[in-house]
Amino acid sequence: MASLIYRQLLTNSYSVDLHDEIEQIGSEKTQNVTINPGPFAQTRYAPVNWRHGEINDSTTVEPVLDGPYQPTTFKPPNDYWLLISSNTDGVVYESTNNSDFWTAVIAVEPRVSQTNRQYILFGENKQFNIENNSDKWKFFEMFKGSSQSNFSNRRTLTSNNRLVGMLKYGGRVWTFHGETPRATTDSSNTADLNNISIVIHSEFYIIPRSQESKCNEYINNGLPPIQNTRNVVPLSLSSRSIQYRRAQVNEDITISKTSLWKEMQYNRDIIIRFKFGNSVIKLGGLGYKWSEISYKAANYQYSYSRDGEQVTAHTTCSVNGVNNFSYNGGSLPTDFSISRYEVIKENSYVYIDYWDDSKAFRNMVYVRSLAANLNSVKCAGGSYNFRLPVGEWPIMNGGAVSLHFAGVTLSTQFTNFVSLNSLRFRFSLTVDEPSFSIIRTRTVNLYGLPAANPNNGNEYYEMSGRFSLISLVPTNDDYQTPIMNSVTVRQDLERQLSDLREEFNSLSQEIAMSQLIDLALLPLDMFSMFSGIKSTIDLTKSMATSVMKKFRKSKLATSISEMTNSLSDAASSASRSASVRSNLSVISNWTDASKSTSNITDLVNDVSTQTSTISKKLRLKEMITQTEGMSFDDISAAVLKTKIDMSTQIGKNTLPDIVTEASEKFIPKRSYRVLKDNEVMEINTEGKFFAYKVDTLNEIPFDINKFAELVTDSPVISAIIDFKTLKNLNDNYGITRMEALNLIKSNPNVLRNFINQNNPIIRNRIEQLILQCKL
């Protein structure tokens, strides 16, 4: 049977781990790495060993002891100590505001008897009587409060370190006085502190007032030893001046440069516009049921002005971590239902790939120091009308999330024409008001953003921000780095898969039913399934491994694993307490194991809900206990094989996704039956149920307890020809009991005979199954 391919994928998935391990060991053992000598390997490759140049840092670290500076005249800043080092006798400094403050400090060497000395202060000759009987230097602070007054000695500092200090702070001028090492500070008043200027005749240092304790230490104990060597050269005070320049958001900075390569830092402010893509798929039938409402990747191209430059940008928006919701209004064909609709919430992420035509993206291959900062944006959903043929329409309305920047990486965007190295911005989500509801249903006050109408009529959502990166680019600006050298993070196959899905779905009309039945009866294996793509055995093995890696994470593989565990648990429970077994316990094996006995009792009353729950696991039961009849998976695998052979776009990279998706999505509307003597019990995935006699095809009451017992003990059969088709066939053509029994058992030979006879009812049923094989 063709469905053998699915069983092989389920049972052989374990070999993938072993294959990966062997491949990794082989790679480690045989990998050769060659690095050519010299600064660069080849001109078309990046440097073998490249490092960053100067790293700009906006953090300003203020030194404790800044200097020494050469003698100068300037207006000292407030809140900074001037520490002046006198290396000879005479005037150390002069300071005035030309209104109420004149002061000068005179240095006198040790052991000087009382005498008169001449000094030039503020351009005038002044004579002072000085004396120093100590072994230390003395610094006389001479002061006057007006231009007509005479100087007088206000303070004296006795020091063997030959250091004096001066500070403008708090409307006063502060200096040191006393004798080291116990000198202290004192101050003089002035009404015009800011206009005080100073003429310094010796080398000096600058110390912030926040480090006044250090200044006190230097006055009393001397400068650090390093400041007293001949290697310390005083600088001009102009070297301290800083040219303030407002940083440009958009700029290109050359970090380092050689003959072939240079490092460029690109700073850019950006405007990101994006929109969500979605897909709404309606089930066939009367028009009351929807199959899927899901998010899809969406491209958006736009232009905006940046510093007078017109920029063309391209974004791709995709989502990850979606939450699957469903709504089932009942089992009748006219009951409204949605099999699955996606909602993004707090556990979801939104990815926006951004590219523009500026220099920053031209050679964005070797990148480091990537950083970004973006604003948040709120996305509020709109309304979507489920247009039913009759009655008032349900409306999905509302829902909102806020996007918050969470990181940036490199990526590759695939447009219709070219692949682009771009930036991928990652956003975390928080739910926001309003909540969403499906009006005229029980679904109300849920939070998140559903995929029905995420753009709410807006052409795009917009956010602003900036990014910075350092890129290694060719020194020649006209040279384009080959895209083949790209080390971007991701290779996105979504565009290829989308084209392949369209091709696969269009091939359904070209499948011959007689050949399909023959193919469905063949035991397909890995080689025969993939031989239509590549003829060599080695490539087929590699493709089979890739398919198994993808398939083991599929819903089918996960469901088989969960069911095996559930049945094991149920068997062990039954062996421990065999006497407790009842119909309800049998039913619980086929319903949600987490429900309590009381809940199951309530569910029995709703036969439609119960049968719908059971039918979802009958595919797994049929796959575990294979019968001789044809199954839906045989047809599914045969259609898959046929389309693979007919496809012109299938390839090694897309095959794993296609096989896995086909196993989950081909023939979603299935019916299963169990046969006991002359009675048949049949249910389908939509919750419909029938019980009827084999010989007359007349309906009888459906007993769910009996059905649960039969499912446990009897084989499950795919209802290829369901009860509705059987009834129609019997009413129009008349069939014998043996033909009816063979069709009930899905006998492939009988099916082939009816198709070869061009029976329109059977052919139409098989055609409908083929048309359900869509991606």
Swiss-Prot record:
**Region of interest: Spike body and stalk (antigen domain):** 247-478
Is GTP-binding one of the keywords? no
Q: Region Spike head: what ranges?
A: 65-223
Which keywords does this Swiss-Prot/TrEMBL entry list?
Answer: Capsid protein, Coiled coil, Disulfide bond, Hemagglutinin, Host cell membrane, Host cytoplasm, Host cytoskeleton, Host endoplasmic reticulum, Host membrane, Host-virus interaction, Membrane, Outer capsid protein, Viral attachment to host cell, Viral penetration into host cytoplasm, Viral penetration via permeabilization of host membrane, Virion, Virus entry into host cell
Region ranges (Hydrophobic): 388-408
User: Has UniProt tagged this entry with the keyword Membrane?
Assistant: yes
The sequence motif named DGE motif is recorded at: 307-309
Record family assignment? Belongs to the rotavirus VP4 family.
Q: What is this protein called?
A: Outer capsid protein VP4
Q: Which organism is it from?
A: Rotavirus A (strain RVA/Human/Philippines/L26/1987/G12P1B[4]) (RV-A)
